[in-house]
Amino acid sequence: MQLQLICEDAALQPYLDAIASKWQLTHDAHSHFALVLTFERLELRKLDEPKLGAIYVDLAGGAVAHRRKFGGGKGQAIAKAAGLNKGATPTVLDGTAGLGRDAFVLASLGCKVQMVERNPVVAALLDDGLTRAKKDDEIGAWVSERMSLLHASSHDALAALASDAEFVHPDVVYLDPMYPHPENKKKTALVKKEMRVFQSLVGADTDADALLTPALALATKRVVVKRPDYAEWLDGVKPSMAIETKKNRFDVYVNASMS
């Protein structure tokens, strides 16, 4: 993928070169998007809209830390959807990892989470955030133990893993495809910013319907699909049950009981 690759300090250039090589990113001086390496972190910026600010992954602080501490634990909707309220601590494959927030919530509640992200820029941001989180005194130990990242398209990876005799199937496959956002729907400033940047960089997941069948083949217990409250069912398939919040809905497709 091509975008501007910028270092805030020349001393960081070898590190940025390594990131570009790892994620197959090439510099394009004319791109409106820039991946910027600072001394603190890796950031994505939309240069033609500087007021949007930088997008980066911070699993140790900010809103993510607040949600971990005060978000409701196993009683919150995502935990119920994944079956944690049944007394289980399932293994999870997050097929649309994005910036890793939902995966982090599940990991903070004890789940081992394998994250899959197909966009190389998003994967680079997530990898950087994960690396920093693993060094954090408070959360580093369990993040290292429970969270891992695979850079691949779930459209390929889910089917490939399902047919791999040596791969241990996860209890739960979690999907949160990017969905076109109607202008008349309100979002928080942060989500609005991220959606604007991501949808112009990545585009909506117009092929998301094709994820459900391989996800059901891979998950031993259930597939959880996060949808906006106004969205139709993934691939038009009615879920076994749905858990609703103010703005979202978790559609749950049950393969087997959690016990």
Swiss-Prot record:
A single GO molecular function term of this UniProt record: rRNA (guanine-N2-)-methyltransferase activity
Known EC number: 2.1.1.242
Pfam families given in the database record: SAM_MT
Keyword annotations: Cytoplasm, Methyltransferase, rRNA processing, S-adenosyl-L-methionine, Transferase
GO cellular component, one term: cytoplasm
Record's catalysed reaction(s): guanosine(1516) in 16S rRNA + S-adenosyl-L-methionine = N(2)-methylguanosine(1516) in 16S rRNA + S-adenosyl-L-homocysteine + H(+)
Family in the record: Belongs to the methyltransferase superfamily. RsmJ family.
Name listed for the protein in its UniProt record: Ribosomal RNA small subunit methyltransferase J
Gene that specifies this protein: rsmJ
